[in-house]
């Protein structure tokens, strides 16, 4: 008598069709709204332009290129919405427990929800592509590769912002915190740069707000950099002195693909970053504890980072606002000491508020006093460092031979200098004024010099 054991080979997959269909049934209104808005922005203008003009005079490549800025904005909005929707089960204890009780690996759950969300947005783009092509053919327009380029651009933009939204969903356990964190990440660099420049204008002698954002700020703000390079707007496309595009600048409409090389470069760089963020989100999802759903911070190591970040980022603008409020009606010059006190107070308040939020209790004292003191100290040191000009900004002048031209603003007049001797005289005058700026503090006149190196 022999016994035979029947075995069945088990297979694991990174994608579960049943979960994908569930996401599609639940979140199809997002796809419907996304595709509907795109139909308003692209197929309808193509149809109207072909109907009101001679089709031979209508440039489909230009029409597609004109929508790139809108593509960035729509991807920003719907990428965040889709990420919040497909991972919303992580924010409730019952739903996350039920989902993780399924005989599916966490990798399968993550990739199914992520790819389904991206596929829904890509399907909307494909529908718009078909409707636009049909409208162009019915209007007598010739199809160009720019239409396919638009599809690639829109789909990659959806991936970029979906990846960013997914990362935000992985690090918090509050559903309402996901869009707040997503919005903060997308504007944090610009906001901190602006606040830092405002503080420097108060404390640093000779500092004025620049006309353009620093390069690092633009690259840390994807929506800003993508709109600049895809939509061909921003300081690099409209220099304040020349008032015209550089001679070597290639317009989107001049390219057969409908997108200039600079736009492709920026898009591919952010796509590579999005892939890295997606892998990072997958790793965080594997280490995320189900019982922490409902907490502001989904990981214990994030709590001190959150407290300190809120204390510093909140204390900076609120400290300046408090200084303005307490200085109303006071006579006298600007008081750096008063500003330091206001910054320290608001930094402590914001730090303790964040501690209460993370700890879900009002009893945070005296345990969180050291962290609050560190926050206040950092803000005070920032003010002192700017006031003392530790980097020598006020005395810094360019070399005369490196200056191509300069524009001087004084009172209600302005003029441009391009002659080398005039530029050399201007640089020397600025150096002399910076060296003797404290000679007579009772009478001061402000002028601005914009150098083009």
Give a label for each model feature.
Residues 66-95:
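Long, hydrophobic alpha-helical segments
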